[in-house]
Design a protein with these regions (language model features):
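N-terminal, post-signal peptide beta-strand-biased segments of exported outer-membrane/organellar beta-barrel
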Residues: 20-95, 174-176, 275, 286, ...
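Outer membrane beta-barrel transmembrane domains
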Residues: 53, 165-166, 170-172, 183-295
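N-terminal signal peptide c-region/cleavage motif recognized by signal peptidases
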Residues: 15-17
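Transmembrane beta-strands of outer-membrane beta-barrel pores
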Residues: 46-48, 75-79, 93-95, 102-108, ...
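Membrane-embedded beta-strand positions in outer-membrane beta-barrel channels/transporters
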Residues: 39, 57, 86, 120-122, ...
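N-terminal export leaders
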Residues: 3-7
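Transmembrane beta-barrel wall of Gram-negative outer-membrane proteins
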Residues: 83-172
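Outer-membrane beta-barrel translocator domains and adjoining extracellular loop/strand segments
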Residues: 85-87, 110-117, 139, 144-152, ...
Length: 295
């Protein structure tokens, strides 16, 4: 047998098992994206950032401090029409907080996947500074051929807040799966633990907050992200700058920047957020914009 024939035989032998393998289930990249534009500026650290509607995407217990209402949105559109958008709202009903939100990701035309979509609804019970939350999540992935794979899953979250000084949080995501269409999605179970600490009194004119978050996910190594933001506020108006650094989730295809920057303009109960990612699934040098209103 010639060397050329040997290579051909080896190729057919190797190809046999591969062709018999099942088609890999789609992985929803959107689940690896930051929960908000603020979190995007902190390299994705958002599990221990309580009091905003977008928290339901990574830790349902995070909406517990909301006293009346919180509405939040964010987006980014690149020249080739690749798009990322999110919106969420949360409110308090007696001893409970409820929230609902959605995220959408449209990929560049060079990627086989057309888009990702996720909806989530959360309920949180709070007693004192301790909050326990649960969320139901719908996720879908569509490819360029128009095939859509859909699944349902759930999240759990626990948060302990120490007034406005600090918060400790733990979140379990993608716990269980119910297939809606197709063979279901690849939803790696994920555990995150986070800590945030206000280094300055939040009732003063200064702002300085540190957050640290570690995440363990199936088929992925442990990741730790550190974020810092600081600024000044006078009579409800102010400016905050932020930066974060740390490894990004494997579910996002290792395409998110490990280091990010961002900032916010504070306008009383409202704020305008900005974040910059040098590298993202939707392209390079991505600018994200968002807004938040908490009356």
């Amino acid at each position: 047998m010639t060397r050329r024939h040997a290579f051909l035989v080896a190729g057919f032998v190797a190809a046999g098992p591969v062709s018999a393998q099942e088609r890999p289930r789609p992985r929803p990249v959107i689940l690896g994206f930051p929960s908000s534009v603020q979190a995007a500026g902190l390299a994705g650290a958002g599990v221990a950032l309580p009091g905003y509607a977008g928290a339901i995407f990574v830790n349902p217990a995070g909406i517990a401090p909301i006293r009346v209402l919180s509405i939040e949105g964010g987006f980014s559109v690149t020249p080739d029409q690749s798009t990322y958008a999110m919106a969420a709202a949360a409110s308090r009903l007696g001893s409970f907080n409820v929230g609902f939100g959605g995220r959408y990701l449209r990929f560049p035309s060079s990627v086989p996947t057309f888009d990702n979509l996720s909806w989530v609804g959360a309920v949180v019970y709070r007693r004192g500074g301790i909050a326990l939350g649960s969320a139901a999540k719908y996720v879908s992935v569509e490819d360029r051929a128009g095939n859509v794979t859909r699944s349902l899953t759930s999240d759990l979250g626990l948060q302990v807040a120490f007034f406005d000084i600090a918060a400790v949080a733990i979140s379990g995501r993608n716990l269980g799966e119910a297939r809606v269409t197709g063979d279901g999605l690849d939803l790696p179970q994920t555990l995150s633990m986070g800590f945030s600490f206000n280094l300055l009194d939040t009732y003063s004119n200064g702002r300085l907050m540190l957050t640290i978050e570690s995440t363990w996910a199936e088929r992925d190594r442990r990741r730790t992200v550190v974020g810092l933001e600081g600024g000044a506020v006078f009579y409800g108006l102010g400016v905050v700058a932020r930066a974060g650094s740390g490894p990004q989730p494997g579910v996002a295809g290792n395409l998110l920047s490990n280091t990010t920057i961002g900032g916010s303009v504070l306008l009383g109960r409202a704020r305008i957020d900005y974040a910059y990612q040098h590298r993202s699934v939707i392209g390079s040098n991505v600018h994200l914009f968002g807004g938040r209103w908490t009356p």
